[in-house]
Swiss-Prot record:
Name listed for the protein in its UniProt record: Subtilisin-like serine protease Pen c 2
Chain positions listed as propeptide in the UniProt record: 17-136
InterPro entries, alphabetized: PCSK9_ProteinaseK-like, Peptidase_S8/S53_dom, Peptidase_S8/S53_dom_sf, Peptidase_S8_His-AS, Peptidase_S8_Ser-AS, Peptidase_S8_subtilisin-like, Peptidase_S8_subtilisin-rel, S8pro/Inhibitor_I9
Sequence ranges assigned to domain Inhibitor I9 in this UniProt record: 43-134
SUPFAM superfamilies assigned: Protease propeptides/inhibitors (SSF54897), Subtilisin-like (SSF52743)
Keyword terms, alphabetized: Allergen, Glycoprotein, Hydrolase, Protease, Serine protease, Signal, Zymogen
Family of this protein: Belongs to the peptidase S8 family.
Amino acid sequence: MKGFLGLALLPLLTAASPVSVESIHNGAAPIISSMNSQEIPDSYIVVFKKHVDTSAAAAHHSWVQDIHSAVNGRMELKKRGLFGFDTDAFLGVKHSFHVAGSLMGYAGHFHEDVIEQVRRHPDVDYIEKDSEVHHFDSPSVEKNAPWGLARISHRDSLSFGTFNKYLYAEDGGEGVDAYVIDTGTNTDHVDFEGRASWGKTIPQGDEDVDGNGHGTHCSGTIAGKKYGVAKKANVYAVKVLRSNGSGTMSDVVKGVEWAAEAHIKKSKAAKDGKAKGFKGSVANMSLGGGSSRTLDLAVNAAVDAGMHFAVAAGNDNADACNYSPAAAEKAVTVGASTLADERAYFSNYGKCTDIFAPGLNILSTWIGSKYAVNTISGTSMASPHIAGLLAYYVSLQPSDDSAFAVEKITPKKLKEALITVATSGALTDIPSDTPNLLAWNGGGSSNYTDIVAQGGY
């Protein structure tokens, strides 16, 4: 596990900038990498400049595949021993992406000779070394009741009389689609009441199943009947991490693209009267790795397309700005709090953290059966509280096809409202550069306007 930021809490690797840029020569595009991530050998994410359209991108793909094939041909001769040594072939383009009509590029496995030519192409903005991504696993386990729902529905610290009471509007989440970009979801679990569906599996050759449990746990906190914040929301599983809880930045970017496109299609269908009752989409990503400009840009592009996005701050007890997607400024970045209203000892912090939500000893749905549950901890558990809360607040608006439809609340406005109505100053052990804000759902009110009018506390 050398260099892998996986399942344990690790210290911040460097106090310097989390991103390094290789030397630029002859006007070539820079190759960037994160100094606190595990790079995948010979794997790259190539991002086009803004002027590149789909036809130019297609021509570029043909060009790079021709170069790749030529290099692989030379390497095949080497494998046959004609030049005296053996080597491995490279796989070429793995994904192409165009996130919400904005961020465009591709990812693949290339020889360094190919990359040297790619970085000199006038259409290329930058190249990022692909790296490992992982879910934020549980730093501690204690079988306990799901106190987190109760906490976000009460202003004051929980007491004996309130610790297990969740105040909520019964229709919370109705008409909202929640995309859980993670390890998958146990869609047959009874707590989803048939509202969970399999969306897309991104890792090549992987199965449409959650073999880990992490994604299912997040989905339950978002939309489960018993364990969820928004109990009527629909869940769509977008699998970007394998059963061991790890994956690649390029697969995560592709997952964000898929979710954004699904949201755009659903929104268009609603405007055309073909998606009755649709109110909007949210997404949750309880995962991360080193700093990735491409992933942060992909998340921001999805938000610009109208998706409400929650991401975990990370479990390194460090500055969230050094990790992606926690550093994506248009998403809601979520730190973890405890039952005692403290910042969880593992939770990341800093100016990139927008809000806190319960993240220690959270009970939710699990894998293994349609009744399975598990208690785990992490900012991974805090973020779906916010994704569920975003879905909850979106659902309080009239649907697009309603006679009472109003101008749709934008992700920017809802993020501002979420912060405005949060309980301020409730938490301890909050660094001075970190917002001391704990999420609040309006205490059971179904009137969004009234909730926002109450402001913070």
